[in-house]
Design a protein with these regions (language model features):
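Solvent-exposed edge beta-strands and adjacent loop segments
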Residues: 1-63, 88-115, 128
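Short beta-strands and strand-coil junctions in structured, solvent-facing domains, enriched
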Residues: 65-69, 126
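Short, acidic/charged, Gly/Pro-enriched secondary-structure junctions
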Residues: 69-95
Length: 128
């Protein structure tokens, strides 16, 4: 593979400290709620308060690891997991993840999911 591009082993899901699936590719989208502060007698809001951030991740082609398979973990059982992305210079971790959608391909076995949509509460970056 070309250098600098993540291979599937560089993107994985971790649950209870164990690697449960490798992910072929992902896209990430961050959104944030905000709230206007109104003041009596003012026609415009006086301030905007930053709300909570939320990260939506679209994961493509997930393969359950042998560990997960032997533990009987499937994609539907996963909760409070992390998505770990290893880049040459840093590591990005999305934590407190929950899945919000799972797409399976009927021809693939239960150990592979075509697309999983995940919502994460936190995103941290650490140097490699």
């Amino acid at each position: 593979s070309m250098t600098g591009f993540p291979t599937s082993a560089d993107i994985y899901l971790e649950m209870d400290g164990r690697k449960v699936a490798v992910v072929q590719s992902y896209t990430a989208k961050a959104s944030k709620t905000s709230q206007s502060v109104e003041a009596f007698g003012e026609s415009e809001p006086v301030a905007t308060i930053e709300g909570q951030k939320r990260y939506t991740l679209e994961l493509t082609r997930l393969y359950a690891t042998d560990n997960a398979v032997s533990d009987g973990i499937n994609f539907y059982d996963m909760a409070n997991f992390s998505l770990v992305i290893c880049k040459p210079d840093r590591r990005v971790i999305y934590s407190d993840c929950q899945w919000s959608g799972i797409e399976e391909d009927g021809r693939l076995n239960a150990m592979v999911a075509e697309k999983v949509t995940v919502v994460a509460a936190k995103r941290i970056e650490t140097s490699a």
